[in-house]
Amino acid sequence: MKKRQLGNSDLFVTQMGLGCMSLGTSETEAMRIIDEAIDLGINFFDTADLYDYGLNEEFVGKALKGKRDQIVLTTKVGNRWTEEKNGWSWDPSKNYIKAEVKESLRRLQTDYIDLYQLHGGTIEDPIDETIEAFEELKKEGIIRHYGISSIRPNVIREYAKRSNIVSVLMEYSLLNRRPEEWFPLLSEQQISIIARGPLAKGILTDNNARKIERVKEKNYLSYSYDELYATLANVKEIIGESSLTGTAIQYCLHNETVAAVIPGASSIQQLQENVQASKQKKLTTAEYIQLQQIAKCDTYALHR
């Protein structure tokens, strides 16, 4: 599988990684999916301390044991579970980040993290203190690089200006083009986008009938059911016999500001289908422009 450089770092990630949030709570099934992902050539695995109270990190750690040097491992920090585990609070403080990284290392059974990401953030945060925590962890060799997982324009702008982040993880797909607003700035700063949700919750897949029906009850982002139906009909007219899943993935990867897409997978079959779709030929410039002309290009209205 082809790789791309993550920002200006020394990390090279496969164009398709595995978003591990969808692995579930069955250790056996989670391990099987991760093992299959490695066998299929994936080297990029994204988890978080928040997922299933840390259980997700434990599964990833067990599955990657003995294969650590083959893998680019990323996890996230900033959300603190309550003692009752019935909710969480936001904590971007230096003390919390430097304490919680030790817990992630323990669960992941590793002594370093390739990419440590702030899992959210607001403009009211003590941003300089947060950056200082990540920079100290880099100097200590506990993390190799750091990034943020955020959709907030004001937060992205501040970290791009004030820190050494190498990536911004955000939801991005043909139906959610809001991150494209940030392509020029992030490209100029040599900061990559990691795209989660490239298949738009299954709407941009070849088996999407049930997913589309759900939009009748509740819109998808700013798309009404009728708008979505018409947009997908136009997409299919452009791509002909090509896979919709593959087209969705190639759309995200067309601009190389995007280092990788990280769709989730809750089964081996789903993983295999995604990897197969990722092998579809690249979109031509003409196809890319045509797709852009028929899909909305909204921007984030809040947190400017």
Residue ranges and their predicted role:
Residues 1-71:
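N-terminal binding-site loop/beta-alpha segment at the start of enzyme catalytic domains
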Residues 11-16, 41-44, 67-71, 110-114, ...:
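Short, well-ordered coil/turn segments that N-cap beta-strands
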Residues 25-37, 92-108, 150-158:
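Short, acidic/polar
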Residues 29-32, 59, 88-99, 125-129, ...:
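Alpha-helix N-cap and loop-to-helix initiation/capping positions
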Residues 35, 61, 65, 98, ...:
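Solvent-exposed, non-membrane alpha-helical residues enriched in polar/charged side chains
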Residues 80-87:
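A short acidic, helix-capping loop that chelates divalent metal ions and anchors anionic groups
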Residues 105-124:
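Active-site groove signature of glycoside hydrolases
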Residues 121, 125-303:
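Beta/alpha (TIM)-barrel catalytic core signal, keyed to glycine-rich beta->alpha loops juxtaposed to Asp/Glu
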